[in-house]
Amino acid sequence: MVIQPELISIDQISDILGDVFAESTCAADSESDLSIEIPVCYDPCLGLDLKSVSDLTDLSVEELIDAHCSRDYRVLATGFVPGFAYLGETDQRIHLPRRHEPRTRVPAGSVAIAENQTVVYPRETPGGWHIIGRMPGSIVSLGEQSIDAKLSIGMSVRFKSISIDEFSQIEETNAPH
């Protein structure tokens, strides 16, 4: 939308912005009713920083997993790469700064924490968050023309802990044949 101030009054601009805000609020409200449960394997072979995060937070691995899975998160923003959603807020006990040395490659599906947020890496990218687990499958569907992200602003997300065997079974089931 382009507004030319010489052709429109302040009152008209205010009315237009009010309408736009009302529409965006309705859209956000309808999205906020959507929720998704994401299975995550918190096995140390997939949660590359699980042990170090446990040590840094003075929580056992089980307490760390419980803290991460025990709440509903809200998608606060998206960005960095398509399908990358910033979820908040994490349990105060697992708030940590980003890693001192970012990784050049974070595997797709990695679930990570930093500061007061958690994320799922939609594809392999560099990253500086603490990796505590990995979801099987993909958080995005790559089509020829577009990327369909499963997470959008306002959605509610909950993580569910799964075993390494369940992770492998889901990966095998979803593998292209």
What are the functions of these language-model segments?
Residues V2-H177:
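Glycine-rich active-site loops that engage anionic ligands at enzyme catalytic sites
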